[in-house]
């Protein structure tokens, strides 16, 4: 984690811990670059795209941090998390982001928090993949979501959007619209 992301993660846990009285399930640990927590790496077209850096199981389900690499021109469908906030911290590249009716461009070093129940989506801009950390608070079942989601988007051609919506719903994510188009963001 970058120092900024580590501070965000530590702050979020401290706040959640204070509010809930829960304590972490795991002791201190380090997760090296290119590695993830056990069972927490998912491939799309043979590339490591989703990597769990901090599992909800590690911290009493108070939060989870997933490292995400998204190719140019791609991103998730417009969706809501009915029971979670999602913080996106851009490490490399740039994304066009919509949250509610607000639209903005985030670049390396920028962060954005999408509150629970607010529709949001992003699309990678430019010619390079976006490299991000997504922090979910509370953790919910986001690791289960990514485990089920990765094989569905790892197909040649267009993925089955009905199946993506079903997997999303199963894991507490509600799809409410199509993915964003990179062309709709002026760089």
Label every model-predicted segment.
Residues 101-117:
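Short acidic-glycine-tyrosine-enriched beta hairpin
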Residues 116-143:
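Ligand-binding loop in jelly-roll beta-barrel domains
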């Amino acid at each position: 984690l970058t120092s900024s992301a580590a501070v965000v993660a530590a702050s979020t846990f401290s706040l959640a811990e204070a509010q809930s009285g829960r304590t972490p399930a795991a002791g201190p640990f380090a997760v090296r670059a290119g590695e993830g927590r056990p069972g927490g790496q998912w491939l799309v077209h043979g590339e490591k795209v989703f990597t769990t850096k901090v599992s909800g199981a590690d911290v009493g389900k108070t939060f989870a941090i997933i490292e995400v690499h998204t190719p140019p021109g791609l991103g998730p469908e417009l969706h809501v998390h009915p029971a979670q906030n999602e913080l996106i911290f851009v490490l490399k590249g740039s994304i066009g982001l919509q949250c509610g009716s607000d639209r903005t461009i985030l670049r390396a070093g920028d962060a954005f928090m999408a509150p629970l129940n607010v529709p949001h989506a992003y699309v990678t801009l430019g010619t390079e993949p976006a490299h991000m950390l997504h922090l979910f608070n509370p953790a919910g079942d986001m690791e289960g979501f990514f485990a089920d989601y990765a094989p569905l988007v790892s197909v040649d051609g267009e993925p089955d959007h009905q199946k993506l919506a079903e997997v999303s719903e199963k894991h507490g994510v509600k799809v409410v619209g199509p993915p964003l188009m990179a062309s709709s963001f002026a760089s």
